[in-house]
Amino acid sequence: LEQVTDSTVDDIDSPVIVRKYNSDEKISVFYGSNTGNSEAICDRIQETLGEDIIDLFNVSDTDPNKILEYNHIIISCPTWYDGELQEDWIEFLPKIAALDLNGKKIVMFGMGDQEGYADYFLDALGIIAEDLIKAGAKIEGKWPADGYDFNKSKGLMPDGKHFYGLGLDEENQSELHDSRLEKWFAMLLSVFSITAE
């Protein structure tokens, strides 16, 4: 798992306070969503950074080769039941994992239930990250595991202190979404070299 970089929100202190952004490259967001929770966060990403920067793709009806058109990518991966991928990701992941993703910079966020499924919290983050790393992608934006209460997670990096990406819990910690997303957006600006006006 040497393709995980050192960039982390631990080093980000300043909040996102501006609303107009510029980027030399388009950023794609690939998501799967049954309940609409993940899709709502993806819509928020596009609304915050702008439609001229963010392209949204629901993996249920997206050609896997579309990911090859972007170097900067955001992956949304909710965890279902006992550590399973969301149903559309079950089919989509093997297809993109078979592609050459060298040079692709990927930031991830996952959604899970740390109380109802404490042994599988954010497992999808780890499942997807490992496959993308094997395909040559670089995973950026590790997220501190402090502030969550769970038993086990495949979403944890080998250091045991960070997730492969942002973790959101709609069922138990929705009141923390705003503060977590604000720090995460600040990290995105750095990772993807997005400038703010």
What are these regions (language model features)?
Residues L1-E25, N37, T48, D52, ...:
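FMN-binding flavodoxin-like domain, especially the glycine-rich phosphate-binding loop
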Residues S28, F57, E171:
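Short, flexible active-site loop motifs that bind/organize anionic cofactors or intermediates
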Residues D52-D63:
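A short beta-strand-loop structural module common to alpha/beta enzyme folds
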